[in-house]
Amino acid sequence: MKFELDTTDGRARRGRLIFDRGTVETPAFMPVGTYGTVKGMTPEEVRATGADILLGNTFHLWLRPGEEIMRKHGDLHDFMNWQRPILTDSGGFQVFSLGDIRKITEEGVHFRSPINGEKIFLDPEKSMQIQHALGSDVVMIFDECTPYPATEDEARKSMQMSLRWAKRSRDEFDRLENPNSLFGIIQGSVYEDLRDESLKGLVEIGFDGYAVGGLAVGEPKEDMHRILEHVCPQILADKPRYLMGVGKPEDLVEGVRRGIDMFDCVMPTRNARNGHLFTSEGVIKIRNARHRDDTSPLDPKCDCYTCKNYSRAYLYHLDRCNEILGARLNTIHNLRYYQMLMEGLRGAIETGTLDAFVKDFYTSQGREVPELVD
């Protein structure tokens, strides 16, 4: 992987990630394909929304279908017929989400399979091996996602163990002679000094890119912004910056303003299946009865297949009837909305008009522009 940085506007960055399988324009949003599919979508449909790269879930793909079946197909690209770049998370967040059915030790994590209750062990070495089998273009280190809230002492112990796991991840990645890219994950909860220590340790190990982890886990939005404003300027300018698991459209805008290059989130797809649709004028809840006889498109400013061909009334009808097509059309729209937002942000950075773009974004939704700390 090669990262090119073209231009900046304030802290916002316009660039690209160049892989053997294709180029990813940044800032970029990665749709989430947890089980090797963006729910309800073919790879061609996902690509048509403007997506350059997908995120796959190491934990879930390891449990089902497993490494052996993946290898029989070649890798995850072949298995799901997506021949463009794929980033896989390490499984750390999913293990963290298991709660009481997992036990974290220095060696790794013991847990019971959420599928059949089988006892399973996952550690940094195994995570690297699974992601190698998946053929991930971007591999994420195995870390512990520090829960929120956490005391400073709890966050320090978690972060320091994640650093030790980062070194083990690096060593195993190198032992496997994996030709792809490995990203480190900055932890430290809401404590700036711990974030500093984490980043310093990761840079000493050496990675191809750096993710900001442990955010969007329940902390106030102000804390997320504060940590990003503190951490991003310290990350080497020639390395991509990835904000994991984020987020709402406004979170993407605020992340870009603070220097983030990559995002992923289940929100556009999950919300689509629940009739919660993002538009240029804010959120539309298509299940609301007001849309029952509305012949207008979902968003007249959107160029997606859904908006060009169907009315709000039709989408309302499909949702009321629990038709699969409704969820699919909603997903097409939400994913295209996210990609159009990223296209707009990239264009604004290129032309030095990001402030105006951000103002228009918030004004169209009747909201004030959040402050950006100098």
Curated annotation (Swiss-Prot):
One GO term in the molecular function aspect is: metal ion binding
Its domain of life reads Bacteria
Task: Give TM regions.
Answer: none
Q: Kindly state which keywords UniProt assigns to this record, in alphabetical order.
A: Glycosyltransferase, Metal-binding, Queuosine biosynthesis, Transferase, tRNA processing, Zinc
| Cofactor binding comment, as recorded | Binds 1 zinc ion per subunit.
Q: Which cofactor does it need?
A: Zn(2+)
- Which positions does UniProt annotate for Zn(2+) binding? 302, 304, 307, 333
* Biological or metabolic pathway of the protein: tRNA modification; tRNA-queuosine biosynthesis
Location of region: RNA binding = 245-251, 269-273
Query: What catalytic activity does the UniProt entry give for this protein?
Result: 7-aminomethyl-7-carbaguanine + guanosine(34) in tRNA = 7-aminomethyl-7-carbaguanosine(34) in tRNA + guanine
Annotated positions binding substrate: 89-93, 143, 187, 214
Q: Where is the active site?
A: 89, 264
* GO CC terms in record: cytoplasm; cytosol
Name the Pfam families on file: TGT
| Enzyme Commission code | 2.4.2.29
Some GO term, biological process aspect, for this entry: which one?
queuosine biosynthetic process
According to its UniProt entry, what is the function of this protein?
Catalyzes the base-exchange of a guanine (G) residue with the queuine precursor 7-aminomethyl-7-deazaguanine (PreQ1) at position 34 (anticodon wobble position) in tRNAs with GU(N) anticodons (tRNA-Asp, -Asn, -His and -Tyr). Catalysis occurs through a double-displacement mechanism. The nucleophile active site attacks the C1' of nucleotide 34 to detach the guanine base from the RNA, forming a covalent enzyme-RNA intermediate. The proton acceptor active site deprotonates the incoming PreQ1, allowing a nucleophilic attack on the C1' of the ribose to form the product.
> Hey, which family's this protein in?
Belongs to the queuine tRNA-ribosyltransferase family.
Quaternary assembly: Homodimer. Within each dimer, one monomer is responsible for RNA recognition and catalysis, while the other monomer binds to the replacement base PreQ1.
| PANTHER family found in the cross-reference section | QUEUINE TRNA-RIBOSYLTRANSFERASE
Q: What is this protein called?
A: Queuine tRNA-ribosyltransferase
